Amino acid sequence: KIDTERLVERQQFDPTLLDPLLRDLLGEPGILPDRERGQGSGVIINNNGLVLTNAHVVERVDDVSVTLADGTICEGQVLGTDSITDLALVKIKESNYPHFAPLGNSEDLEVGDWAIALGTPYGLEKTVTLGIVSSLHRDINSLGFSDKRLDLIQTDAAINPGNSGGPLINSNGEVIGINTLVRSGPGA
């Protein structure tokens, strides 16, 4: 699980709504600092503590923490993001990680292969859903995302908010993709 925080400034209220007499008495409304929190998923991909996740999970954040499967909370550092492919690398600031997910080859996939989505939807840790590969090379532009360059694997494994950044794995336990988006609403 990946938790993020960023400092944002919010105006207390719209100054145009303040009566001019009250404004003279109280002064101009100030700006309040606030912490915005986010959550997503990720997967450790080597024994040096590199975590692969989505760029939209960790972009423009001040703090990143990674909760491991055993409940250990580690400080993370964003090493890089690519908003075009929606991928990011986070380095866990700890030592050795003997357990990490092997990377598979998505080019070996066929429609009908098993697809297993892991993540923390709605903050529910260690969630696993099962489905199949429904389509390969799905064009994201057809979904209205013209700013991305993704070659999508479509699956019917349940993906929900918070699954973003979590691994999509094959029946051999190899990472074949990173859960990125959910299509919902009419026609989904």
Which residues does each predicted region cover?
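Serine-dependent protease modules
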Residues: K1-A188
